């Protein structure tokens, strides 16, 4: 059977998947545990031995995956570039978490910088001590029948964006997550899994 030259089922606008948009787990957690696309992130979080914790709502801007590369152009005698070897490669994620829940605060600012008392007050210390590495997972619906899961086994927050507090925008926390190579994924920084739900259901 000939391949379709055009297939609209592969086209869509990414939106958060029902059952949880994003979760976090301690560094060293085996990411292959969370590849079963029949399960939502909520399903994983409800398991008796669950290590995943929800990061709650994400802003309407969604999740941005960035790729940065550097190359070193090598020229011949006349100045013409003949080879351009890559000298560095990195990937990152930019996202705004909207909830001021403990999981978000501790992920962005570090466990030692977030404390809660028995009177309902949470204190968040702002300092140069960033949090360590975590496993991050993001779930999205990318078409009528397809869902995408992005798994980052070794994500380190390296930046915290400005906080906006005004009467028009939702307040949130916007970290930059640097995705480091992972032995779990044979040196890959992240992997994305795209599943056709009609196939999975079958």
Residue map of PLM features:
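Mixed-charge, glycine-accented linear interaction segment located at domain edges/termini
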Residues: 146-202
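Short acidic, glycine/tyrosine-flanked loop/strand segments centered on an H-E-D-like triad
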Residues: 64, 72, 78, 97-102, ...
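A general secondary-structure signal for short beta-strands and their flanking turns/coil
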Residues: 15-17, 88-92, 131-133, 145, ...
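Polar/acidic, low-complexity leader/linker segments enriched in S/T/G and N/D
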Residues: 1-55
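Oligomerization/assembly interface segments of phage tail-like spikes and tubes
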Residues: 83-104, 168-183
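Short helix-loop boundary/capping segments
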Residues: 102-153
């Amino acid at each position: 059977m000939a391949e379709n030259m055009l297939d609209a089922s592969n086209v869509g606008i990414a939106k958060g998947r029902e059952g949880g948009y994003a979760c976090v787990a301690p560094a060293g957690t085996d990411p292959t545990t969370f590849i079963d696309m029949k399960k939502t992130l909520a399903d994983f979080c409800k398991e008796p031995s669950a290590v995943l914790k929800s990061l709650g709502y994400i802003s309407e801007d969604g999740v941005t995956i960035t790729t940065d590369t550097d190359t070193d152009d090598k020229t011949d005698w006349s100045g013409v570039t003949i080879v351009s070897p890559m000298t560095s490669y990195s990937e990152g994620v930019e996202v705004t978490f909207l909830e001021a829940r403990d999981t978000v605060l501790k992920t962005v600012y570090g466990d030692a910088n977030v404390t809660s008392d028995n009177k309902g007050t949470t204190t968040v210390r702002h300092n140069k001590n960033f949090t360590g590495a975590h496993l991050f997972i993001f779930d999205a619906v990318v078409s009528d029948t397809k869902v995408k899961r992005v798994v980052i086994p070794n994500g380190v927050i390296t930046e915290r964006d400005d906080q906006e507090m005004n009467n028009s925008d939702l307040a949130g926390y916007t970290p930059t997550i640097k995705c480091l190579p992972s032995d779990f994924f044979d040196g890959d920084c992240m992997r994305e899994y795209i599943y056709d739900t009609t196939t999975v259901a079958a």
